[in-house]
């Protein structure tokens, strides 16, 4: 390859790109900053509350105990009674979809319960 093709492939310098791009600074209100830190506090409180639980105790190992009666032949079962036809309103209820319940999980828009210890805020000078 000659020098002209390699010169075309070079990337422009970073300083050239920075001069062309306009720089914008978004002004953020104190309320937005407080809301952001409130969300962070709720996340930290939730992880401490949900993640700090000790593991549940293990169930003891199952140790079956058998007796000779367990292996005896079972008496013959009686035939079940014929099924009854449900009423029309029961059929509708049977085919209806159950109401949706919200999935349990972490909702950062909900304030933590009042019985949980509050996370102390750091004391910082007002701006």
Swiss-Prot record:
Keywords: Nucleus, Plant defense. GO terms for biological process: defense response to bacterium; regulation of systemic acquired resistance. Changing residue 35 to K: Slightly reduces NPR1/NH1 binding efficiency. Changing residue 66 to A: Abolishes interaction with NPR1/NH1 and repression of NPR1/NH1-mediated transcriptional activation of LG2;. Residues 112-127 have a biased composition (Low complexity). Its main location: nucleus. It is found in: Nucleus. Residues 1-28, 47-127 are annotated as: Disordered. It comes from the Eukaryota. Changing residue 36 to G: Slightly reduces NPR1/NH1 binding efficiency. Disulfide bonds: none annotated. GO terms for cellular component: nucleus. Interacts with NPR1/NH1. Interacts with NPR3/NH3. Belongs to the NPR1-interactor family. Acts as a negative regulator of disease resistance. Acts on basal resistance, age-related resistance and resistance mediated by the LRR receptor kinase XA21. Plants over-expressing NRR display enhanced susceptibility to the bacterial blight Xanthomonas oryzae pv. oryzae (Xoo). Binds to and represses NPR1/NH1-mediated transcriptional activation of LG2 in vitro. This is Protein NEGATIVE REGULATOR OF RESISTANCE. It comes from Oryza sativa subsp. japonica. The gene is NRR.
């Amino acid at each position: 390859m000659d020098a002209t093709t390699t010169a075309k492939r070079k990337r422009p310098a970073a300083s050239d790109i920075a001069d062309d791009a306009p720089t914008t600074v978004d002004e953020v209100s104190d309320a937005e900053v407080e809301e952001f830190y409130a969300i962070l506090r709720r996340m930290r409180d939730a992880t401490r509350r949900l993640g700090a639980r000790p593991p549940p105790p293990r169930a003891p190992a199952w140790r079956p105990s058998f007796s000779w009666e367990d292996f005896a032949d079972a008496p013959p079962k009686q035939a079940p009674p014929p099924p009854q036809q449900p009423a029309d309103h029961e059929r509708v209820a049977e085919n209806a979809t159950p109401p949706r319940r919200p999935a349990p999980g972490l909702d950062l828009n909900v304030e933590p319960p009042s019985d949980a210890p509050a996370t102390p805020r750091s004391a910082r000078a007002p701006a």
